[in-house]
């Protein structure tokens, strides 16, 4: 038999999640299901495009267990590109009887088609090879008696006996009746005489749809499309499975003569077309003849007036139209429909136009377009795009003209693995068409090396862009050189370059720049990622700016700018240029001041306006501008009344008053006036606060249970504000003992007093013993902390904190949000060190209850420890809120000790979190079963790194240096967000030089910090590189096995932490950039964050947590992690 008998991969959709589906159609053609002495075969054909997984043919032991066990000889059909077949020669006829399947897979989903073969000389023959019914139908399964024997007839289902008929009652038509068929009734039914065997059995297969007639869906509550020409509605998708010889969304369109398949592209090449081919499709269709043929062997032509598969359809053509046994009614022009019953434009099979065979695209966003004609025009739902892995995409945008429909699809990020054959598919009532095309996805180019700086001047630089070698695909269409000042928040500028050597002009003198190269390949979206960054500094020119610049208001229209005397090194004439501009208005003025002066009055200004001023010293060349100074002119009106006045934390003798003031009114002080209600005006008390930045104050020494009248004023150069109304303050009552005790109670008091004295004596003895024990500890601590009580390290006053730093001019005290001691409910100790403790607590803040972590110092903490602890509060107050730092909730002073409330991180510190993820150590069975070394993915680890970089970028913008950046000082909060913590060593200045001895985190410190005790944001970048190493190594100890002395020796010689085995080169390269010896060559935190965000977008495994052979974790040495 011709090898055309085939399995065709076409398109029944298997619904997956969202808007993506996996699509596959199967057709199995069984040549001569009734086996005689002739050759018979099964052939599978994959049409259209190559499936990702091979198709298979095998024996269906699920349907029939007791069939032959011999393996099938499956070969490639050489007549077609993608086809498999099994051929049985005549001499193997005895081994053919049984059930078979053909299976195909797309994206792991399997579609299986079943069929049977039986002997033509069987005692019974089935009425049909398969029978498809709906749930609830009444079913009669029929077998025709061919041979007469004096034996009982028996019927089996899937090889198991279910029914028998006595020998004298065996009818000519043997039937099995199934009232109200259910899905469990489906299966292979066989009939034979009791003395027969598999060789003499007849088979038929019953298919029961999961839903009732014309219904589909998981709950069978959707109405099926009207499937014509004996098409069957699929109970999972609602789509019509069209019989061989018909196509389209409703199976109305007839194929050309002797063609079949979803798009009618396959052809029966026999002399009589599709005669003797039994076509089997995926359930619930089953098997049938091609259109125009009938009979078990599909070798009988339809009688006149009938057409379609198995000739079950009757022609009822209107207007005297002819009936064709293959296509049905042949309608004249102007008429359409199954019976030519409708007038209208003749339907036209859709065609896909203007789609090239090959498309080259760049990785990134991609918007392919499918354009099709036909009548009726295809709709949005009828056009799809199939990816090489079988994913079906639906249009994101759609439009049509008079002759064409255009579907626009969106792939947000196409990558090289998406290269391959894509298919545009159109399926309408007029037919179906598919057009495969090849997409080649190119990798965007990126230079491997940073550009080199050949020469620099004060306003130019000569650059070798080093565009080759590069990573990715060419050819290169153009090249861009990107550059910008390092410390300015400006967008990157760029110039197009054609040569390798280029000159950058119009640069600012004595400015640090960073630059990189971006390559562009042909095609839309061809701009690659910028390459490595190079930094350089332009030369100086002119004189430095004046020193000691100070800007103060003089009057309502005058500001006074002063500076120290200038002594230029050259004899050239010089002058001071002052630039003044208004913040509120577009008003700018430049003033020239003789070089021998040390001040200038800026006149003709506007009252209550903020100005920005800068200055430089010019000779023949222009000097460098100073930093911007800002000041307000004095006010011309009375200041507005303080706003948001609140009275809180009221006790029997004190209360806290808070307020806010508006900028721009030259407010110099705040006055709080209070008196007992009802007393004379001259009996008030005035509290004058000369620091206008203070916004809260605690009134003390108030009388219990007393009503006070409180007024608050703002004062400026004009006068005091006028309060709109007074505020009432009522203190709480003081708890008192009863004033008089009756004589009858004296005896009771005496008894209780005696018992109390006894208890007091016992308690006193216990305290003395406890004090003696503690005395030993205090003596041990005395030498280290003998000066603790000489001068308090921290002073508190009603929401303000002052640090005694032993400098001539102490800065203004720090103002912090106050928590009431009674609003803190302590729970568990969650962390403890030598001199500090962290407790979990529930606090009440702004009326809301929340979890918090409370930090406090122990009794033996030194003055430096107290100062660092208070410094942490100072830092947190100045930093403000950010999602990637542990934020301050409030603070409380109780009995001379400071209690600091910060966000509670439920997952603890990052170091412990990483080490707990080492599942090979904690749960080896789980690790081996899942082939993983960590419970954390590459994406999660990179998210931790990006969170820390984002927080450190914020700190660097605020000009804060952390000085102790390590995984142990990162906390993991809600939703696994990493937050920077432990600001005890932080400093709010650009460069900090440590002058005192203390514990040092040597393994995380930069070279310049180890050698010179200098700390900058660049030294924090070094520490970040070590933290990144900790993340990748899942909590390993840096330089494990090395002493601190060895580090002091080896780091200046170029030694660095080795690359972890599970680390991608790109991540390790980022670490190495952080460990560059010259601080100014290290990347900024903003650049680090850009690199990490790009890695997260790539979705590549940058940190491999897969369990491979001989896997080992990085070493851990807890003793080495203690600060030196």
Swiss-Prot record:
InterPro entries, sorted: EGF-like_dom (IPR000742), FN3_dom (IPR003961), FN3_sf (IPR036116), Ig-like_dom (IPR007110), Ig-like_dom_sf (IPR036179), Ig-like_fold (IPR013783), Kinase-like_dom_sf (IPR011009), LE_dom (IPR002049)
Active-site residue list: 964
Sugar-bearing residue positions: 140, 158, 399, 438, 464, 560, 596, 649, 691
Gene encoding the protein: TEK
Matching PROSITE patterns: EGF_1, EGF_2, EGF_3, FN3, IG_LIKE, PROTEIN_KINASE_ATP, PROTEIN_KINASE_DOM, PROTEIN_KINASE_TYR
Protein function: Tyrosine-protein kinase that acts as a cell-surface receptor for ANGPT1, ANGPT2 and ANGPT4 and regulates angiogenesis, endothelial cell survival, proliferation, migration, adhesion and cell spreading, reorganization of the actin cytoskeleton, but also maintenance of vascular quiescence. Has anti-inflammatory effects by preventing the leakage of pro-inflammatory plasma proteins and leukocytes from blood vessels. Required for normal angiogenesis and heart development during embryogenesis. Required for post-natal hematopoiesis.
Result for mutant: residue 925 to S: In VMCM; increased ligand-independent autophosphorylation and kinase activation
Protein family membership: Belongs to the protein kinase superfamily. Tyr protein kinase family. Tie subfamily.
Compartments it resides in: Cell membrane; Cell junction; Cell junction, Focal adhesion; Cytoplasm, Cytoskeleton
Transmembrane intervals: 749-769
Extracellular compartment residues: 23-748
PTM entry text: Proteolytic processing leads to the shedding of the extracellular domain (soluble TIE-2 alias sTIE-2). Autophosphorylated on tyrosine residues in response to ligand binding. Autophosphorylation occurs in trans, i.e. one subunit of the dimeric receptor phosphorylates tyrosine residues on the other subunit. Autophosphorylation occurs in a sequential manner, where Tyr-992 in the kinase activation loop is phosphorylated first, followed by autophosphorylation at Tyr-1108 and at additional tyrosine residues. ANGPT1-induced phosphorylation is impaired during hypoxia, due to increased expression of ANGPT2. Phosphorylation is important for interaction with GRB14, PIK3R1 and PTPN11.
Pfam families cross-referenced by the UniProt entry: fn3, Ig_Tie2_1, PK_Tyr_Ser-Thr
Signal peptide: 1-22
Mutation effect (residue 915 to L): Found in a patient with multiple sporadic venous malformations; increased ligand-independent autophosphorylation
Outcome (variant: residue 897 to C): In VMCM; increased ligand-independent autophosphorylation and kinase activation
Residue span(s) of domain Fibronectin type-III: 447-541, 545-636, 641-735
Name of the protein in question: Angiopoietin-1 receptor
UniProt lineage: Eukaryota, Metazoa, Chordata, Craniata, Vertebrata
Protein source organism: Homo sapiens
Keyword flag Transmembrane helix: yes
Enzyme Commission (EC) number: 2.7.10.1
């Amino acid at each position: 038999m011709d090898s055309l008998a085939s399995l065709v991969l076409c398109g029944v959709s298997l619904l997956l999640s969202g808007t993506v589906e996996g699509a596959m159609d199967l057709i199995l053609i069984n040549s001569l299901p009734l086996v005689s002495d002739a050759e018979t075969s099964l052939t599978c054909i994959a049409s259209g495009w190559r499936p990702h997984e091979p198709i298979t043919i095998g024996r269906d032991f699920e349907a029939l267990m007791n069939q032959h066990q011999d393996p099938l000889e499956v070969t490639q059909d050489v007549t077609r590109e993608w086809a498999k077949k099994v051929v049985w020669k005549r001499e193997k006829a005895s081994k053919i009887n049984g059930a078979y399947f053909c299976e195909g897979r797309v994206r792991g989903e399997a579609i299986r088609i079943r069929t049977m073969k039986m002997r033509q000389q069987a005692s019974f023959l089935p009425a049909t090879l398969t029978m498809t019914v709906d749930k609830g139908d009444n079913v009669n399964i029929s077998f025709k008696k061919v041979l007469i024997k004096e034996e009982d007839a028996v019927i089996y289902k899937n090889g198991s006996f279910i029914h028998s008929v006595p020998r004298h009652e065996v009818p000519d038509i043997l039937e099995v009746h199934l009232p109200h068929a259910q899905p469990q009734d489906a299966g292979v039914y066989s009939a034979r005489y009791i003395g027969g065997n598999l060789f003499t059995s007849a088979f038929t297969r019953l298919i029961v749809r999961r839903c009732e007639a014309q219904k589909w869906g998981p709950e069978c509550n959707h109405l099926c499309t009207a499937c014509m020409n004996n098409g069957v509605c699929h109970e999972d998708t609602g789509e019509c499975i069209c019989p061989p010889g018909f196509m389209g969304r409703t199976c109305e369109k007839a194929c050309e003569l002797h063609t079949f398949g979803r798009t009618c592209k396959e052809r029966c090449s026999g002399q009589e077309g599709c005669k003797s081919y039994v076509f089997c499709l995926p359930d619930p269709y089953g098997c049938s003849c091609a259109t125009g043929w009938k009979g078990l062997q599909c070798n009988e032509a339809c009688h006149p007036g009938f057409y379609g598969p198995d000739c079950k359809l009757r022609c009822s053509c209107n207007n005297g139209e002819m009936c064709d046994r293959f296509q049905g009614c042949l309608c004249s022009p102007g008429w359409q429909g199954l019976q030519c019953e409708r007038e209208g434009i003749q339907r036209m099979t859709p065609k896909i136009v203007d789609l090239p065979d090959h498309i080259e695209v760049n990785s990134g966003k991609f918007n392919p377009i499918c354009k099709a004609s036909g009548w009726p025009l295809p709709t949005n739902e009828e056009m799809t795009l199939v990816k090489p892995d079988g994913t079906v995409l639906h249009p994101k945008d759609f439009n049509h003209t008079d002759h064409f429909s255009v579907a626009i699809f969106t792939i947000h990020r196409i990558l090289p693995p998406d290269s391959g054959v894509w298919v545009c598919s159109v399926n309408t009532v007029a037919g179906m068409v598919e057009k495969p095309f090849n997409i080649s996805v190119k990798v965007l180019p990126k230079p491997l090396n940073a550009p080199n700086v050949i020469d620099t001047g004060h306003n130019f630089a000569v650059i070798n862009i080093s565009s080759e070698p590069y990573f990715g695909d060419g050819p290169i269409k153009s090249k861009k050189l990107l550059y910008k000042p390092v410390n300015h928040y400006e967008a990157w500028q760029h110039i197009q370059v054609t040569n390798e050597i280029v000159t950058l002009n119009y640069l600012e003198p004595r400015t640090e720049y960073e630059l990189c190269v971006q390559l562009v390949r042909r095609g839309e979206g061809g701009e690659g990622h910028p390459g490595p960054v190079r930094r350089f500094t332009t030369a100086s020119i002119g004189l430095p700016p004046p020193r000691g610049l100070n800007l103060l208001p003089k009057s309502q229209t005058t500001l006074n700018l002063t500076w120290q005397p200038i002594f230029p090194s050259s004899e050239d004439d010089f002058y001071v240029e002052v630039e003044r501009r208004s913040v509120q208005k577009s008003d700018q003025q430049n003033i020239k001041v003789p070089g021998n002066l040390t001040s200038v009055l800026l006149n003709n200004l506007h009252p209550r306006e903020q100005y920005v001023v800068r200055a430089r010293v010019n000779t023949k060349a222009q000097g460098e501008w100073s930093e911007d100074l800002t000041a307000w002119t004095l006010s011309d009106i009375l200041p507005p009344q303080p706003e948001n006045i609140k009275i809180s934390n009221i006790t029997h003798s004190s209360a806290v008053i808070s307020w806010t003031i508006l900028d721009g009114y030259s407010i110099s002080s705040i006055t709080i006036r209070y008196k007992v209600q009802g007393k004379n005006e001259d009996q008030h008390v005035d509290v004058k606060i000369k620091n206008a930045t203070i916004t809260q104050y605690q009134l003390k020494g108030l009388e219990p249970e007393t009503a006070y009248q409180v007024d608050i004023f703002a004062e400026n150069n004009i006068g005091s504000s006028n309060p709109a109304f007074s505020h009432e303050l009522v203190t709480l009552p003081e708890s008192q003992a009863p004033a008089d005790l009756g004589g009858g109670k004296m005896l009771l008091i005496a008894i209780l007093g005696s018992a109390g004295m006894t208890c007091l004596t016992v308690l006193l003895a216990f305290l003395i013993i406890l004090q003696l024990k503690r005395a030993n500890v205090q003596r041990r601590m005395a030498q280290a902390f003998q000066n603790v009580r000489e001068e308090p390290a921290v002073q508190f006053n009603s929401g303000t904190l002052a640090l005694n730093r032993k400098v001539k001019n102490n800065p203004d005290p720090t103002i912090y949000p106050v928590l009431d001691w009674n609003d803190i409910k302590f729970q568990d100790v969650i962390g403890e060190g030598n001199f500090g403790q962290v407790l979990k607590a529930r606090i009440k803040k702004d009326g809301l209850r929340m979890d918090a972590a409370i930090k406090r110092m122990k009794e033996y903490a030194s003055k430096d420890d107290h100062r660092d602890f208070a410094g942490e509060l100072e830092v947190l107050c100045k930093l403000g809120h950010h999602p990637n730092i542990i934020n301050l909730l409030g603070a409380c002073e109780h009995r001379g000790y400071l209690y600091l409330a910060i966000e509670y991180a439920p997952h603890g510190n990052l170091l412990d979190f990483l080490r707990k993820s080492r599942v090979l150590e904690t749960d080896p069975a789980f690790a081996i079963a899942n082939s993983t070394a960590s419970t954390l993915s590459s994406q999660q680890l990179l998210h931790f790194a990006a969170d820390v970089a984002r927080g450190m970028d914020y700190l660097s913008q605020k000009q804060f240096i952390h000085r102790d950046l390590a995984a142990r000082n990162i906390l993991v909060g809600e939703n696994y967000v990493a937050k920077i913590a432990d600001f005890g060593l932080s400093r709010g200045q650009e460069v900090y030089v440590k002058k005192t001895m203390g514990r040092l985190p040597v393994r995380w410190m930069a070279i310049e910090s180890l050698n010179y005790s200098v700390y900058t944001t660049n030294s924090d970048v070094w520490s970040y590189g070590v933290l990144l190493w900790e993340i990748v190594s899942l909590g390993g100890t840096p330089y494990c096995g090395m002493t601190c002395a060895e580090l002091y020796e080896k780091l200046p010689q170029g030694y660095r932490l080795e690359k972890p085995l599970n680390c991608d080169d790109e991540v390790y390269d980022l670490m190495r950039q952080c460990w560059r010896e010259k601080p100014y060559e290290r990347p900024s935190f903003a650049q680090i964050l850009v690199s990490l965000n790009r890695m997260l977008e790539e979705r590549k495994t940058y940190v491999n947590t897969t369990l491979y052979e001989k896997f080992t974790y990085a070493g851990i040495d807890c003793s080495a992690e203690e600060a030196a």
